[in-house]
Structures are given as C-alpha cells and as structure tokens.
Amino acid sequence: MADQTNPWDTAQVADTTTQTADAWGTPAGVATDGGSTDWLNSAPAPAPEHFSLLDPFHKTLIPLDSWVTEGIDWVVTHFRPLFQGIRVPVDYILNGFQQLLLGMPAPVAIILFALIAWQVSGVGMGIATLISLIAIGAIGAWSQAMITLALVLTALLFCVVIGLPMGIWLARSPRAAKIVRPLLDAMQTTPAFVYLVPIVMLFGIGNVPGVVVTIIFALPPIVRLTILGINQVPADLIEASRSFGASPRQMLFKVQLPLAMPTIMAGVNQTLMLALSMVVIASMIAVGGLGQMVLRGIGRLDMGLATVGGVGIVILAIILDRLTQAVGRDSRSRGNRRWYTTGPVGLITRPFVK
C-alpha cells in the first residue's frame, strides 16, 4: 500500500494520472470494450441482403442511371465543341426570324399575316387571323408571341429540312425503316422533360438550346407521315409512270411527292403543334416567349400573367393549325384554279391573266 505522506511515491502519481485521463469517470471495476474506441461508428454492421424470389427487385439489378450519367459526361467531355458548332446555324436562322418579326411594326405584321391567311385559306380565315392577332396585341403579349413564333418557325424549318429527306429515304429502304422506326418511337414517347437535361449539358441554356430540343421532340411526325404518304401512292400509277419511261427522279417529284403531299402536310401540321407545345415546356431552360410568361405566372402564383401567356399560345396554335391544314388540301378539293388566281394575289394578277 502506498504511503499517503510520501510525495515521491510513484504508485500514487500513476493512480492520479489514470484517474485524470479518464474524463468520463469510468469506474475501475467496469470493463471496457477495446474494440469500440470509435463510439460514433460503433453501430452494428447491416445484415447482408439475400436475393428473394418474392421480392426480386428490392435492389437495383441494372444500374442504368449511373450508366447514362457516365455516358452523358463522356459525350460532354469529348464532343461539346461539336455541339457548340451546331448552335451556329440555329442561332443565325433564329436571329433572322426574330429580327424580321420584331422589327416590323405590329400593324404591318398583322395585315401581312391576314393577307397570307386569306391567300392560303380564304377570306374568312384572313378575317379570323386579323382579329386574333389584334387580340394578342391587345392583351399585351405581342412581342412575346413573335418570339414564340420565331422559335416555332425555326424548329419547323429544320424539321422539314431533316425530316422530309429522311422520310423519302426510309420509304425507299424498308430495311433502314425497320431500324429507324424504334428510334422514332422512342423519340415520340419519351417525356418532354427528359430531353432538357442532356440538352442543357451539351448546349447550355437559352433560346438556341430550346430550338434544338424542340427539333428533336417534333421531328418524328413528319418522318413517319412522309413514309406513309409515299407508300400509299397507288402501285398502278407507279407502274404506269415506269412504262412511260419515267426516271426515279421524275417518279419521285412528279408522281409520288404530289400524291403524298396531303399526308406530308398532315405531318407538317403535327410537327408544328408539337413544336409549339415543346417551346412552352422549354421555357424551363430560359427560353423566351409566351412559355416564359406562363412559367413566371406559375412561379409567382400570378394567375393573370399565366392566363395572358396561355391565351396567346392558344390563339397562335389555332391560327397555325388552320393554315397548315389549308396548305395540305389536295388540288381536287381546291378545284382547277391556280393559286395565283385566288386571294389577294388574284386581285392583283387578274387583269394580267387571261
């Protein structure tokens, strides 16, 4: 036993040091677990999961999300300059449409659009277009409507330039059509919001990425209906043209495309409607126009602002739908009259045409 009066007793010093180091005051008789020094991580290890036929999908079997993420990251790393180069023609054409539509005074643009509608679809449609465009301007949505129209027209132009030749090629190559058709199905059934993430990573945000995602979303209808229209041309007409010595080019431009034009224009109509709907959804990636008004109205709970944008979208959709339907009428429904003998153009040319 240590002497309590001896200050040099080492046993007493060691005992005091041990008590001082034990900050938690653990009693001497209590045994401590040497393996649980890290008390923050001392939770028991989870039990291993075993595959069960009753619940086979409890754990992810195919890590598709990580595969897609890694694939997109690889594409962005290696091909982003290529996609930035694709922006150039889209940006050029979009700026041209915007400068044209926004540069014209509103009364001039309204009269011009009304005359075009009269020429394409008759005087009734011309009057309806005039009243509708005046209504868009009266509710304070004119400039935003012109931006939306520029976006839609740009996307429609690229869809026609890409989709029409692709449809002709696939109509002539059934083997290629079997390969491309599942891709068109995927493009048409994929939710519109899914396109936004990779487009933002590859192109950024703004009007140009909005046009690109609109082109991707709205392209399948014109391709499908071009294939359908060409395949529906009667076989006896094709045989008759071949018997008269028509070349493949003459067969295409003088027989197949004219007879398939109503179906192709139905595809243009569907593409136009999808483009208009996608431009509104693309407002989430900073695309301007009427869709941005709707998005701001939703974000601020401003029912008035959202209603103005929605009414403008509805009016534009109705006008564009009726005009493309009128263009798609075949010659038999319009009669034997030439286009330049009707409408406002006919009023000007009538004195000079016998």
Curated annotation (Swiss-Prot):
Q: Name one GO cellular component term.
A: ATP-binding cassette (ABC) transporter complex
GO BP, one example? glycine betaine transport
Annotated region (Disordered), positions in chain: 1-28
Which membrane topology describes this protein? Multi-pass membrane protein
ABC transmembrane type-1 domain segment(s): 145-324
Q: Which residues cross the membrane?
A: 100-120, 122-142, 149-169, 199-219, 271-291, 301-321
- Places the protein is found: Cell inner membrane
- Return the Low complexity bias intervals: 9-23
| Stated role | Part of the ProU ABC transporter complex involved in glycine betaine and proline betaine uptake. Probably responsible for the translocation of the substrate across the membrane.
According to its UniProt record, which protein family does this protein belong to?
A: Belongs to the binding-protein-dependent transport system permease family. CysTW subfamily.
PANTHER family linked: GLYCINE BETAINE/PROLINE BETAINE TRANSPORT SYSTEM PERMEASE PROTEIN PROW, GLYCINE BETAINE_PROLINE BETAINE TRANSPORT SYSTEM PERMEASE PROTEIN PROW
* Protein name per its UniProtKB record: Glycine betaine/proline betaine transport system permease protein ProW
Q: Which organism is it from?
A: Salmonella typhimurium (strain LT2 / SGSC1412 / ATCC 700720)
